[in-house]
């Protein structure tokens, strides 16, 4: 993962806006951001998005701490830098556009990896609080749930994903913590073609496997406990390479601070998740300034 400057991040965001110029959703989100009433936006949506992505490269998991840093050291670039309250409101207003940005990057990744035939599927828990605070947690009480991973029980969400052998993420989706991995396999692989390798949690019924095979996706998963099933050496080798997508989760959580347990609102929580994911996607070699520039 290479370092990146604020200017580079801004160029990527700017190319995204130019690429989708005239798009109804983009124009709608932009109108909603600036609004007709309320306080004046001293920073454009491009600036807000670039700054919020950049803060994860600077490893500021706390938005207020990053605001203090930006207000002090980025004053030359942003002379009219808003106070924290206005910065927070502008950041929340940019959240719908950031969701569109992340989905657009994933779509571009799938385009660039169209020739790939090997894919890895996995999920990772995204805790919203520690287990001893579950009964007191209020922010995500109505949508988060208890789940169990290989490390034990947790309360929160699951992030399901697909990546290539080169760690290029092709698809991501959030579910509650109680959703079984196997229920997401078809949805995750609907836009890819080739062989998909997963752990024993992705045991699927033969009817589902047949439907996926008709769509060009051939699912291979590690055998569960007490299961006697023959698999080829090639399949076994690829199943053992599932640590590729586990490395993706490790980098997202360690380098880009995906897990966040101090959110004060559900919108603020998912805003943090999506900006963290956006920073990770940009950090990948396939996602530089030419991402939204036609070939």
Question: Where in the sequence are the language-model features?
Answer:
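Short alpha-helical elements
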Residues: 1-295
């Amino acid at each position: 993962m290479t370092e990146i400057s604020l200017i580079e991040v801004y160029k990527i965001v700017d190319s995204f806006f130019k690429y989708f110029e005239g798009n109804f959703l983009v124009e709608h989100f932009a109108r909603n951001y600036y609004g007709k009433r309320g306080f004046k936006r001293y920073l454009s949506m491009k600036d807000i998005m670039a700054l919020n992505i950049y803060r994860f490269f600077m490893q500021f998991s706390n938005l207020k701490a990053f605001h203090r840093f930006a207000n002090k050291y980025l004053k030359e670039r942003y002379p009219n830098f808003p106070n924290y309250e206005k910065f927070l409101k502008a950041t929340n207003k940019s959240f719908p556009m950031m969701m569109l940005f992340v989905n657009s990057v994933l779509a571009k990744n799938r385009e660039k990896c169209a020739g790939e035939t090997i894919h890895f599927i996995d999920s990772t828990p995204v805790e919203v609080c520690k287990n001893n605070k579950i009964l007191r947690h209020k922010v995500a009480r109505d949508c988060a749930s208890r789940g169990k991973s290989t490390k034990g029980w947790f309360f929160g969400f699951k992030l399901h994903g697909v990546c290539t052998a080169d760690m290029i993420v092709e698809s991501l989706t959030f579910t509650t913590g109680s959703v079984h991995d196997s229920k997401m396999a078809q949805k995750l692989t609907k836009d890819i073609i080739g062989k998909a390798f997963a752990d024993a949690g992705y045991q699927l019924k033969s009817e589902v496997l047949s439907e996926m095979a008709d769509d060009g996706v051939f699912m291979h998963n590690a055998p569960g406990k007490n299961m006697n099933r023959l698999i080829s050496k090639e399949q076994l080798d690829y199943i053992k390479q599932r640590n590729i997508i586990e490395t993706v989760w490790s980098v997202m959580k360690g380098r880009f601070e995906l897990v966040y347990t101090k959110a004060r609102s559900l919108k603020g929580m998912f805003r943090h998740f999506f900006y963290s994911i956006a920073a990770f996607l940009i950090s990948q070699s396939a996602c530089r300034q030419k991402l939204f520039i036609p070939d």
